[in-house]
Amino acid sequence: MSDDAGDTLATGDKAEVTEMPNSDSLPEDAEVHCDSAAVSHEPTPADPRGEGHENAAVQGAGAAAIGPPVQPQDANALEPPLNGDVTEDTLAECIDSVSLEAEPRSEIPLQEQNYLAVDSPPSGGGWAGWGSWGKSLLSSASATVGHGLTAVKEKAGATLRIHGVNSGSSEGAQPNTENGVPEITDAATDQGPAESPPTSPSSASRGMLSAITNVVQNTGKSVLTGGLDALEFIGKKTMNVLAESDPGFKRTKTLMERTVSLSQMLREAKEKEKQRLAQQLTMERTAHYGMLFDEYQGLSHLEALEILSNESESKVQSFLASLDGEKLELLKNDLISIKDIFAAKELENEENQEEQGLEEKGEEFARMLTELLFELHVAATPDKLNKAMKRAHDWVEEDQTVVSVDVAKVSEEETKKEEKEEKSQDPQEDKKEEKKTKTIEEVYMSSIESLAEVTARCIEQLHKVAELILHGQEEEKPAQDQAKVLIKLTTAMCNEVASLSKKFTNSLTTVGSNKKAEVLNPMISSVLLEGCNSTTYIQDAFQLLLPVLQVSHIQTSCLKAQP
């Protein structure tokens, strides 16, 4: 009987549902909710027969249902949907179509409506489930990354053979990354219940996206901090292992820790170089032309002459800029004539250098030098230059006499050695060879030193002459005549230096006659080269006198122009 009554009631209820007017604004889900709400106000008798009927109805529809059966809830327990327009229309339709009076057929529709409510869950529940699932996935990923970083740390510590205290420090670094991940998961689980019950699709999607964004940010932070900690840990342990195994690394590390300024380093290097050079000079005096030329103050006088020449050149240019017309043309012609004298006499000096150099001697050079300075009308005495020339000629003559005596002794000893045994000859020959080598070194050293000294004194003399031409002339003399006298003076200096270099090479050849060419030829070539350099320095200093003579000519012309 109960089965037949249920079928009739179900068919009657379906008829009522079909007879109700269909409206576009009321969907099927809303009808189901309205029926359930209308029935929930009626008092339902709690008899065991009704519960059995419910279970039978649910089991009969198990093939078509997906979700588990949901028991009817009170109207107060249901939360209203967020979409206000839909709920108002739905309530209005419910009030118009369903009455709240108790009807005998209302129990069976309640079961069917509950079954329909289970069949179509609210759309917001799917988004909420997806949000919690995404958060749990990201949380598990961050936890996996954290555990991976700690595993990298442990493996690095094991490979670097860290034991004892170092292993304890690595264990202390692990909780930082391990504690950071559970915090993120707890935060994610705390956020889950608050955001899980959205009732509309838009709010659920927004909640899910915000939750995923927060989890991604926290996961990124944990990954970055964990990675940096792991790299720092590996780097420190690697440096410690290298320092323990390599003693040189400790030394370089201590040197790198020192902060030394560049000036201090340069000062220390300069002091060390000075000490090294001082030790070399005390032990053995080297035959370096540049160093010897600087010792005799030749370089300082050459630089001073260059400064004086540059100043004179600037004065000439400024004075020419202030003139115009005929005065400018006349002055230019005079200056060009002085320049032509310098250029013409330079070629004559090169042609007559060899012939005059062979004829002149030390005394003749000193006499000629004094006469030329007197013609310039300058109060300059070549005392230092004359002394240097005299010393050079004296030691050359002494060396030649010593060499001749040594050659005679060697010839006599050779005749005596022929009568003696071969055993007694070997040590004596070794001693004589040592004496000869010392003589060659002394001659070479004296040659280079004499050339450097004579050249330095010549440049010093030209510097003094330039100063006296500008400021200390006793009598006025035309610049063209002064230029001719200076050319003669410079030519005499160059010829004297050339003759000295040839005498030095001759003495070297005589002393090293029994030596091999590999030993003798470099010395002779060096002496000839330094002799050519000496003449070049003197000629360059002479060219620096041209602006000085031009300024002197301008000064004399200005004095004559004044009344």
UniProtKB/Swiss-Prot annotation:
Give the InterPro entries listed for this entry: DUF719 (IPR007998)
Q: Could you give one GO CC term from the UniProt record?
A: Golgi apparatus
Q: Which Pfam families match?
A: DUF719
Q: Where in the cell is it found?
A: Cytoplasm
Phosphoserine PTM sites in chain numbering: 120, 196, 202, 261
Residue ranges of region Disordered? 1-84, 165-206, 411-436
Phosphothreonine, modified sites: 185, 189, 199
Q: Which GO terms describe its biological process?
A: angiotensin-activated signaling pathway; connective tissue replacement; fibroblast activation; fibroblast migration; fibroblast proliferation; gene expression; heart valve morphogenesis; inflammatory response
Q: Which residues form a coiled coil?
A: 343-367
Is Phosphoprotein one of the keywords UniProt gives this record? yes
- UniProt keywords, alphabetically: Coiled coil, Cytoplasm, Phosphoprotein
Which residues lie in Polar residues bias regions?
166-179
- Biased-composition ranges, Low complexity, are 56-68
Function, as annotated, reads: May play a role in neuronal cell development.
For this chain, the family text in UniProt reads: Belongs to the FAM114 family.
Q: What's the protein name?
A: Protein NOXP20
Gene field: FAM114A1
